[in-house]
């Protein structure tokens, strides 16, 4: 970061080769929190130079995932800005120009080695138990000779010419100084044979031209950090502040979490992909809270944060480079807490799509009545239709074994249904104040346990052994429908 640069400028630069996962979401979040705390600019840059792995729908899914987390940006493909274009596929000529500059100043070279030669070279190195590296065959070909070969149609790539003597030291904010021997740094390809620049060149050029002050990214880039340092040094450019985040471990704490293992998590109702977590009923506030604490902490006590509180509390000094195990139990806890913190109208709107996905026509007005009596009972938005779908069913279909209560037979339970119908049909209205006192009197009259009488009534009205508060539920369902359901249960019990 230049001494003269005052503004904090960060970038989140995903490759549209797949869905946005927890690692990408956390990287974007930390960049966003830093900018909001420091008053800088957040840049979204799409690194789409790998055309073979490009997935057409991935970019929009990444954008949707960021928006779901509550993250927005100041500059990007959809917003423009002073340093665009913000898609690397539209910057090919820029990278080519800078690659040629490196060649002209002796910091890069054209390589004409065939795939077959490189494969044989690698095989022999493995046989000799050497560290795989380019052997430098084309490293000292004169530039004019190389350009004549290119003009004649010979295929080539461009490699960075790393120094082979001495050491390179780079400072990472979390890990301190990282020093490597230059002889261990390969002559990496920076431009492929199809003319597309690789990340090592493209990202460094873009970070410089877009005036990026802090690079917050995954720890998988640490091995090539010395290369990136050398590329910037070759151009004479200032370095950003480097911040390489901690690795995510599997829930067991053993081994690095990978995208390939997400299929196994889905079986247990979990995922490392943000769109899956949304579909599984997690609220964005909980996911944001959760991933923020996997690599950062405010103190050893405070766990619950909304986005505003995260911005106020965030600091780079509290980032932790130690690997973080993915703890889905903690996510479930956060989800329940944040659901209970939502306003009723907000929660009603959020659960509506889950009712519709389960086949219910759930109007918002009714949902606003239901939400207060289920808010404390759901740990995920997807649970709402499972415990409250009966509000929107024309008929419920209770199981006979659920209607028959412990210690009673079908005839006794039919009698409970008959008497319940008589009591409730005589009331002007059924609600939490009208119905429950009368039903408790019935419990005394029949000399039964409350669970037996209310158990018959609950299953008859809701079709479920467990439900939201019974009389509040009956008020929302409406007296006519309640009585019809009790009558149907009575018939079922008498026929048993």
What is the predicted function of each stretch?
Residues 2-4, 373, 409, 428:
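Post-transcriptional modification and biogenesis factors for structured RNAs
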Residues 2-127, 224-237, 286:
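N-terminal Rossmann-like or analogous alpha/beta NTP/dinucleotide-binding catalytic cores
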Residues 10-16, 44-48, 210-215, 269-274, ...:
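Glycine- and acidic
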Residues 109-264, 273, 298:
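Active-site cores that bind ATP or allylic diphosphates and position pyrophosphate for catalysis
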Residues 235-398, 406, 462-496:
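Catalytic adenosine-cofactor/nucleotide-binding cores of aminoacyl-tRNA synthetases and other
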Residues 403-434, 439:
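Long, amphipathic alpha-helical coiled-coil segments characteristic
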Residues 431-477, 481:
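Helix-rich, typically C-terminal accessory recognition domains appended to large enzymatic cores
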